[in-house]
Amino acid sequence: GKISSNSSYTIDSSWLNRVQQVVDMCIANDLYVIINMHGDGYHSVDGGWLFCDGSNQTAIRAKYKACWKQIATRFQSYDQHLIFESMNEEFDGTYGTPNRTYYENINQLNQIFVDTVRTSGGNNAKRWLMLPGWNTNINYTVGDYGFRVPTDNNCTAGGKRIMISVHYYDPWGFCGEESTTATQWGSKANNSSKVDSWGDESYLKSQFNSLYNKFCSQGYPVVIGEYGAIDKSAFDSNNTACRAEFASKVCTYAKKYGCIPIWWDNGATGTYGFGLFNRSTGAVTQPKIINAITAVYPSSGNTSGSTSSIDTGKTYMLKNVNSGLYMDVCGAKAVNGTNVIQYSASKAKANNTWKFVPDGKGYYY
């Protein structure tokens, strides 16, 4: 494992260095990053220890606190682009109704996480934190099964800085089951025998609506930290179209009800994989799914407003939000390599006005 067995529970320095390297690469490309404790609570893998049904909760909590103290301290200077999530799919390994005693152990771990991060210095006092309920299941987080939002008395942000974390893989027969039984979903389905008996669009809508009513409306953002559907196109030529529609509907209703969805790309691009890109070459392998997602979120970069508000037939003056100065062509020259500077301006001129040209992918140049 990557955590020492002695009472200090020291995380392997090479491992933590690699995590930081990846975080830095992401932030350098203006991405948001979520660090979580992923899989430590699985009963199905070697090395699992973060068990909500474990007999020695005192030792588990001590190890958990020590790990998050190290992580939070290492990243204390990072800004809002870095988010911490307490754990991933934590449950007792069975898929029935949650055991309330074990659920309370999850609540206790979430509280330890919040308290530890908040008192670890730097920006941690105001960092966004993600908290999952039982197995990141929507019903078991929204319903009366035992989930409790932790107190956050050490937050200095002047407002809530806790997000709720859930996953969405419904219906599982279509989304994750490695079989050829359910290969279609939604209005694109052309063979009813290939459609699961539950988990249709109306169910999806009701799930996200429940998240809004329970959390978003109370000031707690919701992140759908994982969703997706595995590739079964080798068995059904209509599978890709159905997967694309599924992605579109998840994003559409997430947007409507104030949630942020994240496709689970596990790097596997073959049969039964969730991957959208080839991670060795960077090549897109699922353009229809990517297009379905980006069609719901057409804006890009740090723009305020949608791309539909940009008139490509008009010219614009570009004002820097920090300096209040405008982008201006140095000396009004019209040759390649001419520098662009900041300059005060009272009216539009040829050297300080610009056109936006769409690249066809939701961006402009």
Locations of regions flagged by a protein language model:
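A mature extracytoplasmic/lumenal domain signature
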Residues: 37-39, 88, 135, 226, ...
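Residue-level detector of anion-binding/catalytic polar loops
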Residues: 32, 221, 260
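Lectin-like carbohydrate-binding module/patch detector with strong preference for beta-trefoil
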Residues: 305-365
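Aromatic-rich peripheral "rim/lid" segments of glycoside hydrolase catalytic domains that contact
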Residues: 234-309
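Active-site mouth of glycoside hydrolases
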Residues: 1-128, 132-143, 270, 284
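Extracellular glycoside hydrolase catalytic/binding regions
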Residues: 66-69, 73-81, 90-257
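N-linked glycosylation sites
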Residues: 6, 56, 139, 153-154, ...
